Amino acid sequence: FRTPGLLQNLWGLLARHRAYAMMAVPTVYASLLDIPRGEHDLSCLRHCLVGAAPMPLEVFNRFERVTGVKLLEGYGMTEGTAVSSLNPVAGQRKVGSIGLPLPYAELAVALVEDATLQRFCETGEIGVLLMRGPNVFPGYMDPSHDSGAWVVDANGRRWFNSGDLARFDDDGYLWLAGRAKDLIIRGGHNIDPQMIEERLCEHPDVVLAAAVGQPDAHAGEVPMAYVVLRDGSTVSAEALREFAAGRVPERAAVPVRIEIIPQMPMTAVGKIFKPRLRDLAIERVCRETLQAAGIEATI
């Protein structure tokens, strides 16, 4: 999806080559919704796999409604040979979950502190997602990168630390709860940015939303969000904040600020690059602090 113009022609390419399935990140599916399908025959397309980042529920439902194609959410990392879990093609599909572990892929959720596995989590308890099995790589080429990447359980089994937070439900399905490093910690209260992003994506004018923590002298950090709007939209940032305030389930998670930006910073594979958004928030807070103190400086 890095080729310029590919997205604009993707419907045609899928129809021409009679594609049975495709795999992409959520931002690709969100963008496809704004590209007319025209007369392309997509009856060949049976399944669309999605991973790499949480799929906003509104985008999920709208894509299936518009295309009639079933979306299957899954999970994987390069270190785990791309896919480790997936919602079943035939069987119960749980929207919002990353499905069931694939055959031979071992996934576990555990409490990890200082690169030490404290204990495995109970059903429904959130912890760090660990993986092992023949699909998991043995280690990085540069041994220094292995520091903190592995934990060992009481039986001497070695697990790769994904850095993602997750939980198992009663049926054995996995549910992501964000990246450990993406959690917004407001005065000791952990806030999952996904709960903010999903509510903002319910607004008809919002294409993409990303929530991050901005520095705060009192609480350490507070939630804010960046959004990309549909072409021609005139909705204001304050109107979006009011919209979120009425829908975000936790009062502490309501974003204190929303900024409208022309496009999201992306990684090479199409994932929203949150470190850049956090940098933008830090730069703005620093500028405002310096200006309030009457200090002339450039950030």
Where are these regions (language model features)?
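Short hydrophobic/charged patches on amphipathic alpha-helices used for structural packing
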Residues: 7-11, 39, 197
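Conserved AMP-binding/adenylate-forming
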Residues: 15, 46-51, 55-72, 79-174, ...
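Conserved helix-loop-beta element of the AMP-binding
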Residues: 20-24, 37-58
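Short acidic/polar active-site loop segments enriched in Thr and Asp
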Residues: 20, 46, 69, 207, ...
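AMP-binding/adenylate-forming
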Residues: 1-31, 47, 72
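Glycine-centered tight turns that cap/initiate beta-strands
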Residues: 44, 68, 104, 205-208, ...
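AMP-binding/adenylate-forming catalytic core of the ANL superfamily
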Residues: 22, 133, 138-139, 157, ...
